[in-house]
Amino acid sequence: MHISVVGLGVEGQQATISLLKRGYDVYSSDINRHIDLSLLKKENINEEQLDLEIGSHNLDKIFKSDAVSVSPSLFNKDIAKNIIERGLFISDILNKHKNIKTIAVTGTNGKTTTSHMIYHILINSGFNVVLGGNGGGGFSGYNELLLKANEEEYDYMVIEVCDMTLDFCNYVFDIDLIVVTNIGYDHMDVHQSIEHYTEEVEEFIKDKTAVLNSNDENLVKLQNDNTLLFDKYDGKLNLFGKFNLQNADAARVACRELGVSNKNIQKALETFTSVEGRTIKLQYESNEIVSGKTDNVDALKAVLDEEYFDTVIIGTPRKHETCRFNILDYIKKYSPDTLIIFPGLDDTTYDYVQYLNKLGYHKDLRVIKHVDDIIKYIQTLKNKKIFIGGNGQSKITLITSKLID
């Protein structure tokens, strides 16, 4: 079987890797001559089965394929529409997954934890469940999930849906139940406004059963006869933060809708542990540390509002993600004793310092470029409360693992 992959962002590269690992012949293309292919290059792939084209799309090769995977960012473009009209879209060819009871979890923050909670509850209730989704959120991409779901028998499929891929996922998957954790200020370069983002969510949940956050004023406005509300979980939970009580209650309400008993839900959540890269609390020598990805202002605020941290260590976003610089506006108000900046997704530390200077930030500010130097700095601190977060999940996870070891 010959499959084409159109677009080689994170999802496209993940799709290429997933297909090659399964022995498919793959043609992958992207019109951007300067596309970063580091994800593809670090994998041990069979290059003999990969026909890679950078700078253009060969439509003849694409339309002669047995199936075509399209990057979510291209889903509303003409090339995707043409592929769908020709009956070549991969989810229309490999479509067994559409018969599985499917739960989609979306929102600005809490998607990964809530998805894992639902998965954990269902698995511990005796069901066969497949979990996956958004390649930028710690999973191996939508295509990996689709392929897995078509290979074996499952009772349920749980998908983490990125807020920028709602239309794409609505087409690729036959979704039965949607959980929306919250609507916050992230990816505003795509959504343009919180009002427009809310409208996109409203369209996504249309005619479907949806579980919405009663603490989110934008989501409360979307209530209808098909919606259920969640609040804060009041059972035992071994996770840091009030925000995780909301995630747990979202999972509880979703699983009750699926027919899982309260007893099984409570029992499962008692044994649930933090997902790698998400917020965790630990003791390091005499210091109390909370660490986890908080790549937008709402996520950061949710953690920092829990308690006062003397030292805040945050990773920087990509060069083009200036919409995430508003994290610094909140940090100025929060005013930690010491702020450490490190290169998270890109080395935009200089841009962060310049932005803080414009804000008139006068507290102790340092730039530390290397993970080992961050560890060494933490070792000099005594009896401090430290938060490590911001952008750059892989580096945050690495720092956390070194502190635990």
Predicted regions and their residues:
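ATP-dependent carboxylate-amine ligase
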Residues: M1-I35, I62, V68, V260, ...
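Short, basic phosphate-binding NTP loop
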Residues: H2-A104, D372-Y377
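Short, hydrophobic beta-strand segments that form beta-sheet elements in well-ordered domains
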Residues: V5, D25-D30, L52-E53, A67-V70, ...
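Adenine nucleotide phosphate-binding catalytic loops in nucleotide-utilizing enzymes
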Residues: V6-L8, S28, Q192-E195, A210, ...
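Residue-level detector of alpha-helix initiation sites
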Residues: V10, N109-T113, L245
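Active-site regions of enzymes building and remodeling cell-envelope glycoconjugates
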Residues: K41-I54, A80-F89, I100, I175-L177, ...
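Short glycine-rich anion-binding loops that position phosphate/pyrophosphate groups of nucleotides
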Residues: S73-F75, D163-T165, G184-D186, D216-E217, ...
